[in-house]
């Protein structure tokens, strides 16, 4: 049984990965959406400098927005073509959701969380201090993972909406704001050299709850769709 | 109790009795609370007369959070037991909650000008209440943007449950972060026995809180009754159309 489930999951991951690479416009748009505003922010920063603390907070916000861009397409093609319905009948929705989540994390959340702290230093023209960079990278990575988990649920939530892109923005961003508040708090503490673990552990707790809750909730919603 | 109210007929009978009583209590308590707050309570030694906006701002903020908790409870009840009345309550709760959140934000901004010198600061309390307003709006938009009514109710219920994480953030934001917004004066029953606010100012606030509670109760019940009536009309219309 477990071997069969693992094979199903492996098959779906391979499929998702192929689809993702065959449509480079989707993920490239998200990556460019992240890099471009950050580069423009760097330009603006050269004219009117802002503090390193403010800069890293703004870049956290752009990371969440870049992730948001990729969410609308997550289930849409499969739903419109009827494949999602077939997977539901074959009881494979759970494996599909896990596969989509893993591919989203590997292809977008991880690159964004690696790029984030690199770009922070590039844009703010600060000397690299590993003691600051490493905690910052951790904050970016955990925020990106939490946002990806939340993104999967909200993408399914807005699938049947009449104007899904707009509804997705209205639903995803308010839910993301608590995450951003704690991530910005942790980032600020990391930059100032104070204890960043309390806000970061809230983010980790959020992620752990997400890991348990996201798949059954998303599966329930996808099963409800006609 | 929840299961007894799940029957729409019984809910309509019971709410028809509760609504007028709740409205009368809201008006009477509101009049007493406003008289106590605007006339009898002394002015604040620092803020002067401007503090009197508290008698609208604080109960509105309490209700904004209470209505979201009620929305979450109704949503959970709908998802678990499929109670149609719970769905009607949830559908009615988000516009009422959005209105009270907007009142709390606007009165807070008006109060902020004389006491802080600015109408708005991006501190944790104000931002988390603004997020609450966006959550209510997201709930309303999601409900109306999905064509299948039952599907819309289920998805909006999930959104409402996800948004519950914001409530503890609002409640404890003034303790967790250094905010310009003052900490709660009566955050628990223990603090109620020894509040950081003078008794002459406190009792009108509590009376206004009770008045707002009855007002909200009446509004939520009326909104649910309206939704039930709307559904009955639709069923009648469909039956008539087929006949």
Where do the model's predicted regions map?
Chain A
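Aromatic- and glycine-rich beta-strand/loop motifs that create alpha-glucan
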Residues: 2-30
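Short helix-to-coil transition segments within interhelical loops
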Residues: 86-94
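Long, hydrophobic alpha-helical segments
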Residues: 55-75
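Hydrophobic alpha-helical transmembrane segments of multi-pass membrane transport/permease proteins
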Residues: 24-45, 58-65, 109, 171-182, ...
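Membrane-interfacial helix-loop-helix connectors in multipass membrane proteins
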Residues: 46-54, 117-139, 187-200, 225
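A structural motif at transmembrane helix-loop-helix junctions in multipass membrane proteins
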Residues: 140-173, 223-226
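Junction motif at the cytosolic side of a transmembrane helix
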Residues: 208-226
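Selective transmembrane-helix segments that form parts of the transport pathway or gating/packing helices
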Residues: 93-120
């Amino acid at each position: 049984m477990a071997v069969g489930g693992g094979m199903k999951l492996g098959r779906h991951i391979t499929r998702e990965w192929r689809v993702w690479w065959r449509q480079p416009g989707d993920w490239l748009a998200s990556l460019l959406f992240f890099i471009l505003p950050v580069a423009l922010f760097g330009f603006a920063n050269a004219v009117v400098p802002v503090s390193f603390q403010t800069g890293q907070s703004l870049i956290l916000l752009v990371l969440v927005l870049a992730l948001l861009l990729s969410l609308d397409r997550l289930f849409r093609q499969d739903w419109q073509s009827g494949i999602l319905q077939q997977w539901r009948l074959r009881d494979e929705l759970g494996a599909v959701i896990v596969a989509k989540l893993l591919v989203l994390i590997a292809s977008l959340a991880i690159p964004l969380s690696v790029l984030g702290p690199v770009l922070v230093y590039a844009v703010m023209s600060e000397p690299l201090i590993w003691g600051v960079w490493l905690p910052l990278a951790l904050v970016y990575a955990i925020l990106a993972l939490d946002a990806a988990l939340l993104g999967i649920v909200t993408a399914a939530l807005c699938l049947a909406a009449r104007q899904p892109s707009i509804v997705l923005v209205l639903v995803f961003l308010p839910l993301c704001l608590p995450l951003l508040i704690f991530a910005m708090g942790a980032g600020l503490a990391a930059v100032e050299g104070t204890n960043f673990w309390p806000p970061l552990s809230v983010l980790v707790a959020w992620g752990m709850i997400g890991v348990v809750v996201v798949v059954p909730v998303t599966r329930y919603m996808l099963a409800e769709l006609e | 109790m929840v299961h007894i109210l799940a029957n729409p007929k019984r809910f309509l009978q019971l709410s028809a009795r509760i609504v007028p009583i709740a409205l009368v209590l809201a008006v009477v308590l509101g009049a007493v609370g406003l008289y106590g707050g605007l006339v009898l309570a002394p002015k604040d030694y620092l803020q002067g007369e401007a503090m009197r906006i508290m008698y609208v701002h604080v109960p509105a903020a309490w209700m904004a959070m209470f209505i979201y908790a009620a929305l979450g409870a109704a949503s959970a009840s709908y998802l678990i037991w499929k109670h149609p009345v719970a769905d009607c309550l949830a559908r009615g709760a988000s516009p009422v909650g959005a209105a009270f959140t907007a009142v709390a934000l606007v009165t807070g901004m008006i109060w902020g000008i004389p006491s802080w010198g600015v109408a708005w600061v991006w501190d944790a309390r104000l931002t988390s209440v603004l997020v609450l307003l966006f959550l209510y709006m997201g709930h309303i938009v999601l409900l109306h943007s999905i064509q299948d009514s039952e599907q819309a109710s289920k998805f909006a219920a999930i959104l409402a449950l996800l948004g519950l994480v914001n409530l503890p953030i609002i409640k404890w934001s003034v303790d967790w972060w250094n905010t310009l917004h003052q900490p709660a004066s009566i955050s628990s029953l223990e603090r109620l026995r020894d509040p950081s606010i003078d008794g002459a100012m406190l009792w009108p606030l509590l009376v206004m809180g009770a008045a707002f509670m009855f007002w909200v109760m009446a509004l939520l019940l009326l909104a649910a009754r309206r939704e039930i009536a709307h559904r009955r009309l639709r069923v009648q219309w469909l039956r008539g159309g087929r006949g």
